Design a protein with these regions (language model features):
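Intrinsic-disorder-associated, low-complexity terminal segments enriched in Asp/Asn/His/Tyr and depleted
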Residues: 18-19, 27
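Glycine-rich, flexible N-terminal cofactor/catalytic loop recognition
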Residues: 37-83
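Helix-loop module immediately N-terminal to the HCX5R catalytic loop
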Residues: 93-130
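Catalytic cysteine-centered active loop of the rhodanese-like fold, especially the PTP/DSP P-loop
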Residues: 122-152
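PTP/DSP superfamily signal
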Residues: 123-127, 150-230
Length: 230
């Protein structure tokens, strides 16, 4: 039987969902039941799911073949993963920050190299289904999914990949440091960064109250990229 373990947050506030866990779980169940929980194969050559720790139990019967886990350093392995069918898993450990600082481990180039290699490997599998999760499915996981989708369709605009992620995770706020590292590694010459910048701008124009929260949470550079610093 799948379960929904409770998670704790040790990083900056961006990873916390703005809706309750129960609401997120309820919405996710409805989208899965409607057959809308997976990205269209017109956009990517494999199935992709994005979620937070509290939602992992909803996917243990989803025939997931690959799991990308992005966790805070020292965080225990999510118990819900033990209920999944046998799968390949990559675990990365860093905080949801965009600048290195005392007590915080920022994502490094090697981390992004690993997640991109994981994405390339699964693309060669037969009918792969990738699940990407971080703590809330908001920042680290959406950045990783954006890069993997961009890599999977090199001839398509990076913005298309990001918008696909946003349609699946409307509260997405991709971690800028991960995006910048991936943009450079994929040789996209700022295209993915620009897509993220445009997304930040749309979110902050719609919800300007987030500006102070982002700045207080150490994410002021993302606000600046959106052109919203006063």
């Amino acid at each position: 039987m799948c379960s929904l373990p409770r998670s704790r947050q040790t990083g900056p506030p961006i990873e916390l969902p703005h809706n309750s866990t129960l609401l997120w779980a309820s919405n996710l169940r409805r989208t899965r039941e409607a057959g809308m929980g997976l990205f269209s194969r017109r956009l990517v050559p494999f199935e992709v799911t994005i979620c937070g720790i509290d939602e992992l139990g909803l996917h243990c019967e989803g025939r997931v073949t690959h799991v990308l886990s992005i966790l805070d350093p020292g965080w225990p392995e999510p118990e819900a993963l033990s209920a999944f069918d046998p799968h390949q898993r990559l675990e990365l450990r860093f905080h949801d920050v965009i600048e290195a600082g005392a007590g915080w481990m920022a994502p490094q180039q090697q981390d992004v190299e690993h997640l991109l290699a994981f994405g390339r490997d699964l693309a060669g599998e037969k009918e792969p289904h990738l699940l990407v999760h971080c703590h809330a499915g908001v920042s680290r996981s959406t950045a990783a999914a954006t890069l993997i989708l961009t890599q999977a369709r090199p001839g398509r605009p990076a913005e298309e990949a990001l918008l696909t992620v946003v349609r699946r995770r409307p509260r997405a706020w991709p971690n800028l440091r991960i995006i910048e590292l991936g943009d450079a590694l994929l040789g996209r010459r700022g295209e993915i960064v620009e897509a993220a910048r445009a997304h930040y701008r749309r979110v902050l124009e719609r919800e300007p109250w987030l500006i102070d929260q982002m700045i207080e949470g150490g994410r002021g550079r993302e606000v600046a990229e959106a052109g919203k610093l006063s």
